[in-house]
Amino acid sequence: MFHSIEEALEDLRQGKAVIVVDDEDRENEGDFVCMAEAATPEMINFMVTHGRGLVCVPVTEEHATRLQLAPMVNANTDKQGTAFTVSIDEGSTNTGISAHERSQTVLAMLDEQKDADDFRRPGHIFPLIAKAGGVLRRAGHTEAAVDLARLAGGIPAGVICEIMNEDGSMARLPQLVEIARRFDLKLITIADLIAYRMRTESMVKKEIEVQLPTAYGDFRIAAYTNELDGKEHVALIKGEIGPDEPILVRVHSECLTGDIFGSYRCDCGPQLHAALEQIEANGRGILLYMRQEGRGIGLINKLRAYKLQEEGLDTVEANEKLGFAADLRDYGIGAQILRDLGVQRMRLLTNNPRKIRGLTGYGLAVEERVPLQTPEHLHNKQYLSTKQEKLGHLLHLNG
């Protein structure tokens, strides 16, 4: 159904448009997207005729600053936080609304000899400011357009137009598939663009690596910074890491209450210690400690979830009651750290099939799942049962 990002980039380089679909839980919409430098009158006319939405021009913050594109409103209350600027027309246009004149405005925006005084405000082209970091910071069509233009080798600016049906309703996936077929356009998802960038770019920086003697044995500890959000992650490394055989790996998400305070509500602490013991016994391996407290919802929200569990909800229901998915963790940054450490093939210490899928999706080979069984007891029995029944964890529970 969907095309690859590589196929879409090739079409964009040839001046074609593609259809980009966002997440079902977000806007659940498709937009026509092209590189801004491909915004011919024919392209604009195609978008307004067959898309029927608003023609917008996503640009970088630097681009918006150069043209003095101020925010459209002082207080942005849009549900998705779309960063509209004041609308513009190129100064020599007439009304600015025709396909020819909208094309003229878009192309003028790319001319570095033009400045703010060369445009009238308001107008008929609606610039949008993409977040620095692109779809890795905000999974919107704005960021997707700028990312795609950059990845295609062009100026990081695009043209987008929402796609509506003839009756004025929003086109959903079945209609978008038909539109892509009718006009021979590539159809891609923002989720696939995120995965592509995580596979092909590096967003992590190793800051330091030192020796770390522990109660389990002698390790090296390497600290990494996620350059997108500033979060710090660490890897405990045992032995030499190379491609000659699969490496024993544990990807462990931070759990202050379990790892540090020995909470009985979860099995995180016992899993952490068991993993270190197994890596030490194996003589070689990596424990990657990721700052993803509470399966990604953070410490305060995890404690709020505990409160809801005291009122009778299970761990999944509590997350959903707070407005979160059952598991918000993303394994892309972890995969980049493992790649930086030289890991290509691994034996993964986990009971979580989603973790296996998450890491293999970023180009790492999981050649074996090594179970990580820890004791169950009165306090964590329901928690473990919920992980097994609702999250698909591969556990062997008593009764």
Curated annotation (Swiss-Prot):
Database matches in SUPFAM superfamilies: RibA-like (SSF142695), YrdC/RibB (SSF55821)
Leader sequence residues: none
Reactions the enzyme catalyzes: D-ribulose 5-phosphate = (2S)-2-hydroxy-3-oxobutyl phosphate + formate + H(+); GTP + 4 H2O = 2,5-diamino-6-hydroxy-4-(5-phosphoribosylamino)-pyrimidine + formate + 2 phosphate + 3 H(+)
Function: Catalyzes the conversion of D-ribulose 5-phosphate to formate and 3,4-dihydroxy-2-butanone 4-phosphate.
Binding residue positions for Mg(2+) 2: 27, 141
Name the record gives this protein: Riboflavin biosynthesis protein RibBA
Site (Essential for DHBP synthase activity): 124, 162
GO molecular function: 3,4-dihydroxy-2-butanone-4-phosphate synthase activity; GTP binding; GTP cyclohydrolase II activity; magnesium ion binding; manganese ion binding; zinc ion binding
GO cellular component: cytosol
UniProt cross-references to CDD domains, sorted A to Z: GTP_cyclohydro2 (cd00641)
Family, similarity comment: In the N-terminal section; belongs to the DHBP synthase family. In the C-terminal section; belongs to the GTP cyclohydrolase II family.
NCBIfam families in UniProt: PRK00393.1 (NF001591), PRK09311.1 (NF006803), ribA (TIGR00505), ribB (TIGR00506)
Organism, scientific name: Brevibacillus brevis (strain 47 / JCM 6285 / NBRC 100599)
EC numbers for this chain: 4.1.99.12, 3.5.4.25
Region (DHBP synthase): 1-199
HAMAP family for the chain: RibA (MF_00179), RibB (MF_00180), RibBA (MF_01283)
Residues binding D-ribulose 5-phosphate: 26-27, 31, 138-142, 162
